Amino acid sequence: MIPFGSKSCLAVAFALASCTLWAATREPPAQDKGPEAEPPKAEGHKFEPFKPEAVASNGSVTVGGHAISYQAIAGTLIVHPKGWDDVPRDPNEKPAPGAPEGGEPPNPTAEAAMFYVAYFKSGGGPRPLTFFYNGGPGSATLWLHMGAFGPRRIVTSTEAHTPAAPYALVNNASSLLDATDMVFIDAPGTGFSRIAGKDKEKAFFGVDPDAYAFAEFISEFLTKYGRWNSPKYLFGESYGTPRSAVVVNQLESDRSIDLNGVILLSQILSFDLSPDRPTGNPGVDLPYQTVLPTYAATAWYHHKLPAEHPNLETFLTEVEQFAMGDYARALAAGSDLSATDRNAIAAKLHDYTGLPVEYILKADLRIDGGEFRQNLQGDGNITTGRLDSRFSGPDLDPLSQRADYDPQSSALGSAYVSAFNEYARKELHYGEGKMFKPSIRTFRTWNFSHQLPGQGEGPLSPRQGTNVMPDLANAMKLNPNLKVQLNAGYFDLATPFYQGIYEMRHLPIPQSLQGNIEYRFYQSGHMVYAKESSLKQLHDNVADFIRRTSNTGG
């Protein structure tokens, strides 16, 4: 799940625990040997490197009326940041002629133990392999694991707060084990993953070091489990979608690993398009345009529109045309827009959002996500959901200009965290003595600067919004057979569905490669799978995508 910048994501996080293993030792006191005796020297703290783990178990899941036996492996693989070499440099080696003073830099000391749960179908021939991860940044992958495709699924309320424990774990009839073997990965420092060593946050908390760690993990996994010749897929949700764009490009460019497909759920590749506080970037009006269809879908769902629209998809097509037509021209005019045209656009925005014309004019025709969520049902002191705008909850502060929390995250978080802890410890037999961290506070310290493909070693200025569209485009050009599937919910105000369409239509790729991209939309939110009927549709679409692109004739 969890979207970048979500306060509610952090609300379900446990307090951070120490993730480094230290051993403090001292030599025993030296015997008094007279005047020549030297005082003992303290060795200080010594970092004990992580060791890989693997705990195997067996289970069965029924999908489509067929029982599938599987082996589950819960464990960790050890990854290192860029620049690390498995052959340590000899400190006594003299630098080569012309080398920098002091020779080559020493190996980075930071490392990560990345936690994963892998599911392998028992028996049968070669199988596709899909790597799953959520986003954040700073989120573990319990959301996709327990809510979408793992063999066990947590039961939650569809559009209301799930009652407190006990929670129900059931057979997941929408598990993707019928189409692919699966690997669910926790990002460094999240879930049961741990980081340690000097500058560990710098080594793993950023667009590029995070992607490098995932690419390293995937390479190690393919070796450990002998899966180099398997059809390979990435499945990322939310921040996991920009991660996928960078990872697929790194795998193909730096490691010569071609993938069969990339599956994106709730996509954001260009952060300049985020509907959260676009007022901080005046002159860039696209976020207001690409979020407008989601505002319309939300107002339609809550019956806030002045007119009836019996077919949601037909209505949204109309709104999309307005957003990229008359609305785009009005915003581009800026202060040159006439009063007559301004009033006409405000009236049309009222028709599509349900917000009062006076409010829209006061907002200069530009309404950001937090303000929309606070005001759509504000007359009843109700806050509208961010991750899933079908959800509602009482205002924390009825006088606030913007929404203070996300009712959907508050409604589901406890069920998911409790279910995964129960499942991991009792059924996967992993985690004794370890704290599970569903999310960690990395967003404000995350390094969003990014080195673009083909730009040498110079990183993108951190003052620019992160944009990884060139990475996905580069991967598609390097591997013209790479297929991409975009999945999105109509009621997602964190990563609006039309934003994903806009990004894909503007990838810098030849027109012929646009045919490698397919789109699937759902009457659901950011966590499409939180609605059981949408989960079934998502399963069917993804399974079909894998079967069509795996080159196995399945």
Per-range role (PLM):
Residues G334-A494:
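Alpha/beta-hydrolase fold catalytic core
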Residues G236-N249:
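Glycine-rich nucleophile elbow surrounding the catalytic serine of serine-hydrolase chemistry
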Residues Q523-L535:
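Catalytic histidine-centered segment of alpha/beta-hydrolase-like enzymes
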Residues R26-E43, W84-A203, R505:
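N-terminal cap/lid subdomain of alpha/beta-hydrolase-fold enzymes
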Residues G226-Y239:
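Alpha/beta-hydrolase fold nucleophile elbow
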Residues L482, P496-H506:
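Short alpha-helix in the alpha/beta-hydrolase fold that links the catalytic acid
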Residues L177-T180, A187, F204-T223:
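Alpha/beta-hydrolase active-site loop
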Residues P151-V155, V248, E252-T353:
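A catalytic-pocket lid/entrance helix-loop region that shapes and gates access to the active site
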